[in-house]
């Protein structure tokens, strides 16, 4: 009685690595975009809006 060889292990591992890589990459990119980038952009936009309001009041 022989045991059947295990097949498809490398293919499964490669697919799992690719899926995991894209998933983690997407999560980290989303965190960077919404957690860091948009915070900086909102601060900059707020500064320029206040600056424009001050210039508008001076004139």
Swiss-Prot record:
The keyword Transit peptide does not apply. InterPro entries: Cyt_c_oxidase_su7a_fun (IPR014368). GO terms for molecular function: oxidoreductase activity. Its main location: mitochondrion. Component of the cytochrome c oxidase (complex IV, CIV), a multisubunit enzyme composed of 12 subunits. The complex is composed of a catalytic core of 3 subunits COX1, COX2 and COX3, encoded in the mitochondrial DNA, and 9 supernumerary subunits COX4, COX5A (or COX5B), COX6, COX7, COX8, COX9, COX12, COX13 and COX26, which are encoded in the nuclear genome. Belongs to the fungal cytochrome c oxidase subunit 7a family. PANTHER family: CYTOCHROME C OXIDASE SUBUNIT 6C (PTHR28264:SF1), CYTOCHROME C OXIDASE SUBUNIT 7A (PTHR28264). This is Cytochrome c oxidase subunit 9, mitochondrial. It comes from Saccharomyces cerevisiae (strain ATCC 204508 / S288c) (Baker's yeast).
